[in-house]
Every structure is written in structure tokens, then in C-alpha cells.
Amino acid sequence: MLPCCEPLPLQTEKLELPSISQVHTRGPVDIPWYNHHAAERPLLSGDKLPALSLPTASQPPISGQSYRTSYEEASASHNASARTSLSGTAPVINEARSPPQSADLAAGGQGRLSLDSSAPQEFSIPQNTVGDSYYTNPTAIGSMNHTQPYMDVHSSHLSSAQPYASQAATAGGIAHYPQYHQQPPVLQPASTTYGPASSYQYAYPGGVTSSQPGPQPPTTSVSSQVPAQLLPLPVTSHTVAPAGYGNNTGTPMQGYVYDATGQVAPPGAKPRVTATLWEDEGSLCYQVEARGVCVARREDNHMINGTKLLNVAGMTRGRRDGILKSEKVRHVVKIGPMHLKGVWIPFERALEFANKEKITDLLYPLFVHNIGGLLYHPTNQTRTNMVVQESQQRRLEGPQATRASQGPQPPALHHHHSLQTPVPSHMSQPHAMTSQSAARPGLDRAHTFPTPPASASSLMGITNQGSSYEWGNQGMNSGVPNTQPLSIDTTLSNARSMPTTPATTPPGSNMQGMQAYQSQSGYDNSKSYYSAAPPSHPQYAPQQPLTQPMAPYGQTMPANTYIKNDMAPPTARTSGGPSDVEQADVKADRYAQTNGHVSNGAGEPVPEHEPEYVQHDSAGYNTNRGSYTYTTNPSVGSLAGDHSQLASDMSGSPSQQNGSGRMTPRTSGAPPQWASGYNTPPRSAAVSSLYNSVSETRGASANGTTDNYSVASNPAPGYSTGMNGPLGSGKRMREDDDVDQIVRPDSRGAEYESKRRKTLTEATVGGPVGGVPLGLQPMKAGGVMARRR
């Protein structure tokens, strides 16, 4: 290529655009613009190309050497539109040529130019810098569009096959930027090489698309740009590009024949399929991501999530919902992972929609009949098969069977484990699963598809529910350490697993799962003295035994129990917490538990206010309190933790569940106790137990009833404690209780207040781990409010 020399002066006045017919004198030009094969023929030196000039401004032909400079200068002087300099690679005829008339150019249309450029691509794109300069002046994008038609002409007129052709393609694609990327191929004398290489390499991803309005494959930028939509170009030049943009743009590739069946992969498309187990439906779901949207297809009935499908098409919500509402056969899913929610429609209807919206190729291989064969293909075939087999097994067994108390071996768990291999060993579950998951590579939900652990957990939760026994384990399945996973799963699967919990919950594994919470056990330990103190009081003494029943609550503290317990309130609580009738007893009971009382009321005539208070939130609230109590008496909780955990699971008290849910978040912190309470609406119940723990003396002196009552009054503080954390907070809470007194039910009365004060008087034994300092007393007030709730 000649070195760029001083740019030739632009002679705009004398240039005349040759008529289009002249331009067409080239053999290739005569051929339909889109016929890139014809265009592929290199220009002969004899071929005359019109000077490249923008339709708006005529440009004197520039010698090859000066192309770049002239191009740059021209672009500067003539704006992008004037830029027609060709790359030095192809010598340009020095004789000034008139650029095709703008009208002619307009008539040629971009499509024409694009086609031409796709052909020999020898035509240089006047506006686009061609050859070397094409990259220099990508600025002529706007002008490029004008020039493109003309680019065709130029291409035909260029004396020799020039990389200009590639430029033309680029310009056509307005891929001058990409063009630059593409240029290297373009530079090659043979436009053919340039066309396909640059086209597919850069064009489809690059500017070509920009030139073309939308989805046109940018590859073979010129040809595909304009004409791609109009005429299918030979696959040869587009073969690569289609692969790239076939999927990217969603428009069929030029050389690619649109496959309305969805069975044929667009050129260059790589089937990317992931699978997830939809526990709720008991089916494996294949997922394909297009335009950032995960479209799922069920393996059992092959229904497809129509909502996500139409989202891929970029349809508005109103139109999408209207279309889906009119579907006769549809399955509406409102609960579950986000990518599985929506309106599921039959496979055939989904395919029709995809074809109407021209997104079938984008969704490949969603509609492939044997989509399972593409899953993790080919490297993970074994794992894929295992997943599919397990899914089928689950279907055979039925989701219910899995959920029923299958014990530690629910196939669902297997799935989860398999999916979440990370979990396998941590649950020493008896489940064959563990070994299975160990054996097979883990298909973490996260790995398999973009589903948040939460959604996975819901699935897992079900699994757990199926084998609630496995809560801890399953929580682990989520890939979190057993302990943590438990807390996670616990939250999601508490309600679900409650029913199965009694039968399936393995205390050992659960405890393991809760180990993390157990670390909170330290918190319990801090309250250990509370446990000890309760022993000092008869009331408290029972507390320790109660600890076990309470353990579910205390469990929050023990972590092991805590998690499970969160899931279900202790038996006593279960009966008491939920039922108002037992309120007094429950309250006492709860407090007893909270305070470590073994007896349900410990026979203590807990002030009626307290039961009354319990009644306010009694069932759930007391249960919550129990949780708080646990917080207060973590040591007790710890003691009873294991069996307590089981007990709470068995009891399946909703409040406990709530506690667990809340516990999970808060429990992560030192105060699982109040976390548990938090699950139920944050209530002071735990506080009261905390209170009792903190002011065991108070409880004792107040007499069992008083103590319990104190506990009740404590609940507000306890709540505060739960919020504040440490028992110290609980004390503060008591102080708050004094303030709270007004807020609290009259039933509490002075007695309650005195009890509270007693508690307040007590030295802060040490709040829940990370408990809030007295400064957090306001929290207590909040706790009181929660209690009122």
C-alpha cells in the first residue's frame, strides 16, 4: 500500500457521480446487489470505480498513498459524509471521478450498497474510511449511511479489488468501528475473505448492527445489514456471522434458513441448557437464557414459561399478559423461584409465539425435542443423566412421597444434594444422597442456572419439608455450611417442613446443622448463669429441665436446636403458644420454658395479665417469647437444644417456626434467641424469658407467678433484648418496662411493674451476645409494642 502522502486537494466541484448503470457495469454489480458471490470476484484493474464521495459532497479521487490522509482531512473538511478516501491497500484511480449522484445513491439504497459490499466488498465505503483510513475515521457513521448505497457504486468502480469492499461492508454495516476490527480480513484483496471473516468476526457483534436497524446480523456487515433481512445471502459469507448473531440478534442469518421448528441450531450457536429441579411440581426444568431472561421448560409435560418467553421478545407487560390470559391451556405459577413464576403454556403454543416474535433461534435449544441430550453436553453427560434419572424417579415417587416423611432419604433431597453437592458430606445424613452427591459433581443450583439460593431454597425447603428430618442437612444442601444452611432453609421450609418434622427430623443431624447457631451457644453460655440462677429459684430450677422443652427456644441459642426449633416451637409452646386457652399456662409455661421452668405453668399462677398478655400475641407471641426466652436462657436452650430442637420441630408450633425464620436472620448474630422471637413478629416474649434469666432473683422473689409475670413484663424488655441482644439489654428492657408499664396492659399492673423493676434492678448479667447496651432501651419499647401486637 502506498504510504499516505499529502492529501490531494479535494475537488468537489468537478466530480460527477456516474449513473448507477455505469456503476453497475461491473459484472458483479450487474448481479443482484445481494449476490455476494458475484461481488466476490476481485475487481479488475480495468474496472473503473466511481470516485468515492459522499452523496452530499463530491470528492476528487485520492491517490492510494494519500487515501488515509485525504480521508482524514476530507472527513475533517467535508465532515463524515465527505470522507470517501479509500485505504491505501487498494490503489485508487487518480483520475477524478464523479461520485454517483446523491439521488442515484439514494435510489441504490443502503440495502443495495450493503449487498454490493457484501459481494466483492471491494467497493470502498466513501463515507467510511476505507482501507487503512477506515479505522481512522469511524466518525463518518452518519455519513456512512448515506454513502452506503454509493459504497456499492464505489466498490464497483474501484480499479482493483480493494479492502474498500470490506469497508463498504463495514459501512453498510456501519460497522466502521467493528469494521476496523474486521478490517484486517477486509484488507485482504479478496473481498470474499473479508466479507465472511470480517463479517462474522466483528460485524455481527460490531457496528454492522448499528448500521442496520436492528437485529440484522452485523456480520457480513454490508451484505447482512441492508439486504440480510431482504434477501438471504449465501450462507458462505454469513456462516460464521449467523452463528454469532443468529443468536444475538434474534434475526435469521443471511445465509441461515430460519428454522420455525426450533430443532436446528442457528449457525455458530452453542446450545446452553441448564436444569433445575422444581420441587413444588416434582419436575425437572430445562432452562435456556436469551437476552438475559431465563426461559424454563418442564421435562414432564414440556410446558414452557410463556411469561418469560414473551419477555425475551421484549413485549410490553400489558400485551404479554393479554396474550397469556387468552390462552386456553395454561398453568399459572405464583409461588416459587422467580424464573419459574408466570403463565406456563403448552410447548406448541410457545413455539408459535416464538416464531411470531422471531425469537426461536434466540431460544435455541429450548424447543429441541431431546433437549435433555444437550444438558451439560457433552462433558457433564453423566451428571446430566443422573439429574434426569432422579427427576424421573421423583416423578414416579411423587412429590408427596418425597415430602411425606421420607426420612432422611427423600429423593428430593437426593436431588438437592446432587444439585448441591457441596452439602453432601456435611449432613451425615443417612441419605444415600450424600454418597450420591459426593459421587456426582455438584450441580449447585447456582451453577446450573441463574436462580438465587432463595428460590433454590424454596425448592430445597420443600425437599426438607419432604424430609424435614433433613432441615439442617438440607439447609446445608444449599451449599451453606450445615449450620447456616439450616438457618436458611429453616426460614423457607419451616412451614412446609413442619408437618414432616416430627417424623423425619434427626436430632443429630439437625444439631449438626445448627452448629453454626450453636456458636451462638456462646451467647447461651453467657446466659449460662441465668440458667444457673433459675435453678436457684424453684421456678428457674425447672427452667433447666424446661430447657429441653424450652430447648427449642433455648435451642435458638444452641444453634442446633435453635435452627430446628425455629422451625417449630417446642411442644409445650406449640400447644400453649398457639392456643389462647392455654395462655396462662402457656405463658407460665412459656415463661417456665423461657425461664427454664419445666412445668407448663410450673403451676405458677402466672399473673393473668401475663397470660392475657400472652393471649394478645399469646399463641404466636408467646412462642416468640419462648424464643426470646431462649435468648434469655440460652444456656438452658443449649442444654435442651438437641431434643428441644426435635421437640420444637415436632410441635411444629407456628410461632417457633416464625422464631426460626426470624432466628435465622438474627440468629446469625449472637442473639438467635431474639432472632427466633423475631421470626414471629419481634415480640418481647423472648425478652421476658431474658428478663427472667437476667433477673432470676426477681422471678424467684416475685414468686413463680411473679417471676413468670416478670417474664411477661420482661417480654417487652425481652423484645428489646431480642432487639438489643444481650440480657443486659433485657435488663434495660426491664427499665424500659417501667416506662413501658403505661403501654402494657393494665392487667400487668403494679405487680408486673414491680417485677419488672426487680428485673431492672438486677445487674445486667450479660445480654445476649452482641446484646444492645442500655442505650438500646428504646428497642425495648419497640418490643413492648410488638407484644401488644
UniProtKB/Swiss-Prot annotation:
UniProt keyword Cell membrane, yes or no: no
One matching Pfam family, short form?
A: KilA-N
This molecule's function is given as:
Transcription factor that regulates asexual reproduction. Binds the StuA-response elements (StRE) with the consensus sequence 5'-(A/T)CGCG(T/A)N(A/C)-3' at the promoters of target genes.
- Family affiliation: Belongs to the EFG1/PHD1/stuA family.
Q: Which GO terms label this protein's molecular function in UniProt?
A: DNA-binding transcription factor activity; sequence-specific DNA binding
Protein name (Swiss-Prot/TrEMBL): Cell pattern formation-associated protein stuA
- Note the InterPro entries from the entry: EFG1/Phd1/StuA, HTH_APSES_sf, KilA/APSES_HTH, Tscrpt_reg_HTH_APSES-type
Biased composition (Basic and acidic residues) is annotated at: 741-754
- GO biological process entries: conidium formation; positive regulation of transcription by RNA polymerase II; sporulation resulting in formation of a cellular spore
The primary gene name is stuA
